[in-house]
Amino acid sequence: MRHMVWIGISLAAFATAAAGHPPPLLPEASVAALGDELSGETAKRNLEGLARLHRQRGSRGFHSAAELVAERARAYGLSDVQILQFPADGKINYGTQRARQAWDATEGELTEIRDGKSAKIASYAAEPVVLAEDSESADVTADLIDVGEGTQEGEYAGKDVKGKIVLASAQPEAVQDIAVGKFGAAGIVSYAQNQRTAWSGENDNLIRWGHLETFSPNKTFAFMVSLKTARLLKERLRLKESIHLHAAVEAGQHPGFYEVVTATIPGSDSELKGQEIAFSCHLDHQRPGANDNASGCVTILEVARTLQKLIGAGRLARSARTIRFIWPPEVEGTETLLNARPDYAKRIKAVVHMDMVGGGPETKAVFHVTRGPLSLPSFIHDVAWAFAGWLNEESYQFAATGVADYPLTAPEGGREPLRAIYSSYTMGSDHDVYQDSSFAIPAIYLNDWPDRYIHTNLDSAANIDTTKLKRAAFIGAASGYFLANFSSRDIAAAERAIAMGQLLRAVTSMQRQTPAAPAAEYERAVRGSLDEFNSGARPRTQRLKSAATASAAIIYRRLQEPRGPMTVFGYDYFADHARSAAIATPKLLNYEGSWGSGEEYAYEALNFVDGRRSAQQITDELSAEYGPVPLAMVAEYLRALKGIGVLE
């Protein structure tokens, strides 16, 4: 393995260096125009506006954010600026997404009553993140009881929590049915922590954004506190001290709308302007939610401003295809849009998706250009990497020597090199929806990870680097503009980008010891995607053919409805329907492979179903992508999908 790692380093260095002078894919005049006009500062000023808003789905704060984006888009001269509204009443289904009702809050205070005096512990007015999403109104005075993680019945043994408030380390949604539903607790105080990184626990003042289960019958409230506060409370409880709390909450779900902001730069070609290249992000999340994901929202807005201005000034030609910009609530908004408006799904040929693209050094963020899933081969990811790899080299040369033609730094930003990584497919944002086999729209995914402040009170504008915003905007703008003009004249240049991408994929295959046949078929399919894109055909997910024999011969076909991934946002289509059909949870969903989790195996297993592959072939593809997985697990999951009416 040591030798493989060194080979990987050498090839990666070659692939990046080779993307140096001159700029790839676009004329240098176009690259210079983009570099000159894109502004990280303009993007950050817009970000500061969004970060003041608590942008929960369907809320007044989200609507204000949508209005802010729409107003800017109109001011920048974009066309067809709209705030689309789709009813969300808790009953309507948009594909695999059950529409969650809107949620709003006006008050949330948690205080301790002690010796006739009150001391405030948490205030929604001061920090909205302290009140868990989907909390319901309450006016409760009760003792606090420590239940550990709060997810296992044994943690409640010998404790009288009925009518009390429980202190738990798990997310409120994982606690509410057992604490409130089974044992009668009045509410929850949670100190749930972020996704684990090297910096976990380092800052015990972080307050994590919390969630209650939207569709749980056990309605309640939950407050989020820092690890520091939780430790103090736990120690007092350990010493048998009574802690008396008062919770005052005015909040709740109500029928509302999913709001999706959209705008366009119309294409110029009479035959191609009906096709669209979309820029995507997600507009929701807690205040401040600066990197996640005000950064993605304002960066695609900056791309829109820049392209519109340069086209209007004649510095860039109007693109042949229409360029569309979309600002939805995360995942559920995209799932709703593509199901409620199938004309959008039909017109969009490719997506540039941005989710967390501005994290400065304080966040410890690493910038990724993330490839698509193995089930949907496409050259568009290599296009994005061509620009990112070139910018890696330019920014490094500037950092190392002070001299570079295109360092793309911002006046208020840093001068560090970009150090972008071309990463294998990872899940967790709206790109999952686009690339689901229901829609099969390839999506470039630009994203930061890790970020030690994600989903917390400290994900603030102060941690956003304007240079990072400008560079992310450049990679996105250059990629989207190239694709919006792509024709047979660009095939040779795109093939050079594919060759560079293939080198890096070969390194990954060597390190993971991936079987050669699936990798070779994938590369042929990537090359074939050029012709599909140019012809206007919809990308096909069924290009790969396993070299393995079909020892498990059963073949499934996905039904036309429902469309979308099985797990969306705040709703698990598979789990809900499996319960109704009395189907046990398939083992695949809890499987941990070499390079993927059960969620990823399940996502791709469904994507690989095409009416041609056998269960054995799907297993082989999954093993090549995420590591060896037993055929029995895959076959069980496919049978379960058939059982809930997704496959036939």
Q: Which ranges hold each PLM region?
A:
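Second-shell loop/turn segments in exported
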Residues: S30-E37, A51-R60, Q97-A99, L131, ...
